[in-house]
Amino acid sequence: MRVAVSASGQTQLDELNPRLGRCEYFVIVDDVSGETWAIENTGRLSTGAAGIATATLLHNHQVDVVITGNVGPNAFTALEAAEIKVYTGTKGKVQDLLEQYRNGNLSKASGPNVGPHGS
Amino acid sequence: MRISIASGKGGTGKTLVATSLALSLMDQPRPVQLLDCDVEEPNAHIFFKMKQAGSQKVFLPIPKVDYDQCQYCGKCVEVCQFNAIALMKRTLVIFPDVCHSCGGCWYLCPTEALQPTPREVGAVGISQSGSFTLVSGTLKLGTHISPPVIKAVRAKEDPDSIVIIDGPPGSSCPVMTIVDGTDYCILVTEPTPFGLNDLVLAVEMLQVLGIACGVVINRDVPENDIIDRYCEDKGLPILLRIPLKTEIARAYAKGITLVESDPHWKPKFLELYQRVVREVAQ
């Protein structure tokens, strides 16, 4: 299973960037192999609807779970269709959020937690 | 004659000028049309207690998928410049509020799995009293692309009438849509740094579009020449000055137009119109 964290840098020591559609990178951890790598969030370069582009990117990278801060209505709809589960945290390093997720201390989003950002 | 009214900054008095200008032209031989194109917050109707004669819905096409035809090739996703379509597993997710109705997806779909279907984006209402017509556009709640509704209002323009178009603030697409093809644009501003800043943007936009313009200074105060200096520098005519007066604000806040609250403004608005006609003729 692949877990992605929206981050401002490329390692587990970098901070969570709570803006799903506009974060710089996703740090991805594969639960089974234990491998960690980062992908650039090219979705953030969209002039509008960055959340949808970002969800497509995560889908293309076969991500199963995304940990982020804020998820808007369009991004949530897209992630739901891609069967990507969304967990939300507030702040901390990528490794801290992964730890909280593994311990069941992060809440699973059942809907968007912020309003539309416009497009 | 088609006159657009813009401002740059919001709340400077576009509707105040548009409504009084329209009322001052009632005695003219030609009929008068007032188009309320501030479709996100239309309010000109408040000043005219007229009954709406009819209303038409405005639709835009958005794609609808026929899953029996879809081959999940992703061509539509690739074509869409607005991220309005996402292909997730075996689902094509369409985001109507992101779609700009360009038609690229249904034109280029290799199996014709996408077909345009109408989506309501707003309405156009028409009220009439004698030779005066008020056309108001309203953007549907939750929709944020206003130019199609503005264009639907402007489709009601009568070439034999004096057409006054009251627009939204700003200087981007919605405002460009209201000034497009008009003979003249009246820019209503206020003598503040904010009024000037946005006036400059509006003037620059009009220069790009090649539309002649002049300025009305609202809430004018004698000791302040911030707008005058800019207009002098740019060679822009100052068409009218409306002073900063509590009585004007008080009447307007009750939904009474300037020319109705103080009839001595009527000849001034008539002169404003004649000045615009002369400017256009030049």
What do these predicted ranges mean?
Chain A
Residues 1-53, 60-61, 80-82, 89-119:
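Non-catalytic interface/targeting segments
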Residues 69:
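Conserved residues at the C-terminal ends of beta-strands
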